[in-house]
């Protein structure tokens, strides 16, 4: 785990108590111990270094404590020599992160002055495939995911996005962010029609849209498209099983709202195409910067 996604912030004393599922995840799945260090992503997006201060197995709770005294408000200076509960903290204790930490990933992102925000218009596939797409898009740092009701979308797949499925997608996003260390607060929105999606994107400024096409007709070079102008937002539209119909390509490319791109590769599954397209665009933009 690169970071822990918290639903609330530390209190004025620099402590954060976690219960229930969070306790189970940290103590039973990750098996953290008192003194272990971990990065915590707060609701406001801030990344805070903390330590496991106290584990109460009877109450099924775990208390985290801020490591950086500068993060605690005036008059509430936190001593790292001792804690209000849980006893002694030793900052030399191990971190539970393996490899690159979330703070290192965040520093790299902050160094990029021309950071681009990514949006995915994903034509709704079968539920299991959508879960995989959401997971991979989150790991890649996509900000907004809009499920699109398309010509080839099955009615059952749209209905499946209601109720418990939405909660499951939020859980998938949280787990993907914790494992990848993504600083981006990825959101999955309610399903919308392709027409509504076009109207939404038309309102954007300094934005660019790309639709992945199975056909070579109307296709443009990805490099030329991304070199046209400086953009702050990029949207990638990806088809579901059956792809994007010619009628939908026409709607997206109308008024030059989206540019069609055909990759000269084998026919890709929709979940593969989404990851391939996101990675291709991000790689080019990173090289450009």
Language model features with spans:
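A C-terminal functional module that forms or caps the active site or interfaces directly
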Residues: 234-251
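Generic beta-sheet signal
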Residues: 118, 207-210, 232-238
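N-terminal positively charged helical leader segments and presequences
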Residues: 1-81, 85-109
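Structured adenosyl-cofactor binding patch, chiefly the S-adenosyl-L-methionine
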Residues: 246-289
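Short, acidic/turn-prone active-site loops that include or flank metal/cofactor-
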Residues: 217, 241-242, 265-268
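Short acidic/polar active-site loop segments enriched in Thr and Asp
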Residues: 143, 232, 258
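Short, ordered loop/turn segments at secondary-structure junctions
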Residues: 69, 149-153, 265
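RNA substrate-binding interface of SAM-dependent RNA methyltransferases
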Residues: 76-82, 88, 97, 105, ...
């Amino acid at each position: 785990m690169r970071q822990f996604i918290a639903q609330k912030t530390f209190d004025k004393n620099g402590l954060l108590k976690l219960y229930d599922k969070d306790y189970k995840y940290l103590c039973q799945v990750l098996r953290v111990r008192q003194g272990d260090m971990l990065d915590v992503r707060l609701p406001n997006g801030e990344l805070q270094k903390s330590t496991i201060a106290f584990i109460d197995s009877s109450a099924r709770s775990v208390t985290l404590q801020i490591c950086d005294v500068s993060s605690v408000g005036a008059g509430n200076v936190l001593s790292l020599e001792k804690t209000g509960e849980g006893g002694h903290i030793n900052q030399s204790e191990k971190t539970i992160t393996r490899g690159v930490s979330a703070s290192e990933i965040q520093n790299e992102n902050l160094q990029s002055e021309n950071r681009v925000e990514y949006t995915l218009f994903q034509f709704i596939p079968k539920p299991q495939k959508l879960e995989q797409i959401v997971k991979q898009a989150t790991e890649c740092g996509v900000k907004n995911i809009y499920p699109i009701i398309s010509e080839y979308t099955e009615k059952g797949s749209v209905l499946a996005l209601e109720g418990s499925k939405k909660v499951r997608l939020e859980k998938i996003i949280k787990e993907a962010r914790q494992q990848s260390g993504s600083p981006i607060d990825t959101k999955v929105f309610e399903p919308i029609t392709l027409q509504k999606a076009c109207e939404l994107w038309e309102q954007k400024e300094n934005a660019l849209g790309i639709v992945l096409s199975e056909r070579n007709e109307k296709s443009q070079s990805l490099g030329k498209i991304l070199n046209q102008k400086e953009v702050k937002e990029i949207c990638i539209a990806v088809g579901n099983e059956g792809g994007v119909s010619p009628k939908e390509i026409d709607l997206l490319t109308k008024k030059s709202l989206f540019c069609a791109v055909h990759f000269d590769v084998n026919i890709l599954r929709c979940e593969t195409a989404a990851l391939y397209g996101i990675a291709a665009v991000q790689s080019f933009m990173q090289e450009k910067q």
